[in-house]
Design a protein with these regions (language model features):
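A short amphipathic alpha-helical interaction element
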Residues: 54-101
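Gly/Pro-biased beta-strand-loop elements
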Residues: 196-295
Length: 334
């Protein structure tokens, strides 16, 4: 995955070409096509063992997987206790009426123990995981525009997104095993792939770098780490609404809209795919040119800055997109 112009996700224009949008409002919205596919069961992965031993699972990995399944995402699961995991713990604690310290105490461990299911599961790599194509994604935007699709660059990257994990973690869990060979049985995080309830409100907290989904009573039932704004392109604080949802969006790059663009850049139409600058989903907001979207580099979420938009991992953006619709209130706050 290429990191160049990751911030080129806001002050943008997206062409709406796909017929199916998550909206009733006929007003045009940024375009999609192919939703991100979570680790849906297949004949191969439902055969023999579908769970893996949890006996040797690292404590931090265990916590990250349980938080993911509880809908308080730590972002990319990597087995490391970092800021995203601590924010997820704090959100989980608030949901359960516990002091939101972001630290693992006895009460938090007990609440996490109530999250059902094994930590790891066994997945059999299928042909679709490894057949590609796996293009080398160029850094230059015009060169990107010359590709048919900005797909995954490797089977490891594709499997990482499927299981909300870093490719390095998958390699660590499966020493000596080929991630790019159909038929390989892998230990993978047993992550959440179900849909969330419909959200009555989206809340983005700039200071805490999280996006939250709340019910009609204002109770937060899901939380995701996010990247929001910068000194040059601040998050547009205020109350907005969702215009609509577009999957697999085409990104219309206009260098005039970016303070850090290369002076030699020209306008370009960037094809869809998980390595598109806005990832697999664009949730259009009533604030012109702004939206909630995915990313080609999940490891950077919550740790970098954007051009004003709200950036999530692709799998988080997909979950949020399925939980909102036209008119859903969005509060962007300090």
């Amino acid at each position: 995955m290429n990191t160049t112009l990751l911030g080129a996700a806001c002050a943008l224009s997206l062409a709406l070409t796909a017929p199916a949008l998550a909206q009733d409002d006929p007003a045009p919205v940024p375009q999609p096509d192919e939703p991100y596919a979570g680790p849906a069961s297949t004949a191969e992965d439902e055969s023999p063992a579908t769970t893996a031993s949890d006996h040797d699972v690292d404590e931090t990995l265990r916590v990250q997987v349980l938080l993911d399944r509880a809908n308080f995402s730590p972002g990319e699961i990597d087995g490391a206790m970092g800021s995203n995991t601590r924010r997820a713990i704090a959100g989980f604690q608030r949901y359960h009426g516990l002091p939101d310290t972001g630290e693992l105490d006895a009460a938090t461990r007990k609440a996490l123990d109530d999250v059902s299911g094994p930590i790891l599961t066994t997945y059999t790599v299928v042909a679709d995981d490894v057949d590609g194509p796996f293009p080398d994604i160029p850094a230059d935007m015009e060169a990107k525009a010359g590709l048919e699709r900005l797909g995954y660059e490797s089977a490891a990257e594709a499997l990482g997104e499927k299981f909300h994990a870093s490719p390095d973690l998958l390699r660590k869990l499966n020493p000596g095993k080929a991630l790019d060979r159909a038929g390989t049985r892998l230990k993978v995080p047993n992550v959440n792939t179900g849909k969330l309830p419909a959200a009555d409100k989206v809340i983005v907290d700039k200071s805490d770098s999280v996006l939250m989904l709340a019910d009609e009573d204002g109770r937060v039932f899901a939380q995701f780490p996010t990247t929001t704004g910068s000194e040059h392109d601040p998050l547009p604080i205020g109350d907005w609404k969702v215009n609509g949802v577009a999957r697999d969006p085409v990104f219309h790059y206009n260098p005039d809209l970016f303070w850090d663009a290369d002076p030699s850049d020209t306008r370009a139409e960037i094809p869809p795919g998980p390595n598109n600058p806005v990832g697999v989903v664009w949730i259009d907001l009533s604030k012109e040119h702004y939206g909630i979207h995915g990313t080609p580099v999940p490891s950077t979420i919550g740790k970098t800055q954007s051009h004003g938009c709200i950036r999530l991992t692709n799998w988080s953006a997909d979950l949020v997109a399925a939980s909102v619709g036209p008119g859903t209130p969005v509060e962007l706050r300090e």
